[in-house]
């Protein structure tokens, strides 16, 4: 996981709700399911938070889409709001 984080460190999106993104990864059918199954429960939040901080949400969404892991309408609109300015 460390190599993955280092390789993609240039992606950086502020994550506001880690629990939501942990659930998002846990629902993965390919690719990111390893995050919740390969680390202990006591370390899960710490490891996943570090992964999000380094990869950023948009990068993760792109990778999941490329893996065929997202269906149309799978991602709630609130996820897109992370990168939008507060006053449009």
UniProtKB/Swiss-Prot annotation:
Top-level division of the source organism's lineage: Viruses
Record protein name field: Protein U62
Organism: Elephantid herpesvirus 1 (isolate Asian elephant/Berlin/Kiba/1998)
């Amino acid at each position: 996981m460390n190599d993955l984080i280092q390789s993609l460190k240039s992606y950086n999106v502020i994550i506001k709700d880690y629990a939501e993104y942990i659930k998002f990864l846990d629902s993965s059918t390919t690719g990111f399911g390893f995050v919740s199954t390969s680390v202990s429960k006591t370390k899960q939040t710490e490891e996943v938070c570090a992964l999000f901080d380094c990869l950023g949400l948009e990068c993760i969404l792109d990778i999941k889409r490329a893996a065929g892991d997202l269906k149309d309408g799978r991602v709630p609109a609130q996820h897109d709001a992370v990168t939008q300015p507060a006053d449009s």
